[in-house]
Amino acid sequence: MSSALIIGDGPGGLSAALYLAKNDIETTIFGQDETPMHYAMLYNYLGIPEMAGSKFQEIGRQQATDFGANLVDASVEKAEKTDDGFTITANSGDTYSGKYLIIATGPNRELAESLGLERGDDGAIGATREAETEVENLFVVGRTTRPHQVQAII
């Protein structure tokens, strides 16, 4: 069982994975190469001044795994709350468990909604500044928490 499961390997998911792994928290991140990140231009994420989304994803994945994060090249089809935390099912059929779950799926909010989170009037999933939701140990980061695309400043 991982301590933290992260669904999504865009800027939000990779940032979370990097900081968790740097702090010796067992982290598993799920993502695929098929992503709109390839068309993005990012500024000042992970200490990188400016870079295309494809290169950012490559470097972010490498940084996170260098610090011990486990990267699973898969999409997640199902997420469930359990007594011990969360269990997710990848498109391969494999299941993974963790105490904490971070959803960083961009504008796709279906997994968040399947866990009981609701969209606000603006269409975004609500979370505190610390990314906490009303579901214990469930966090939501990145565009999942915003109604439209913006540039975050870190």
Language-model segments: residues:
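Short hydrophobic core segments
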Residues: 5-7, 95-107
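Short, glycine-/small-residue-rich phosphate/pyrophosphate-handling segment
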Residues: 146-154
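FAD-site-proximal beta/loop scaffold in flavoenzymes
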Residues: 108-146
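Beta1-alpha1 glycine-rich phosphate/pyrophosphate-binding loop at the start
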Residues: 2-55
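N-terminal Rossmann-like dinucleotide/flavin-binding domain of flavoprotein oxidoreductases
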Residues: 38-92
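Residue-level detector of anion-binding/catalytic polar loops
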Residues: 26, 70, 118
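Hydrophobic/aromatic ligand-binding patch that stacks against planar heteroaromatic rings
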Residues: 15, 19-20, 101, 111, ...
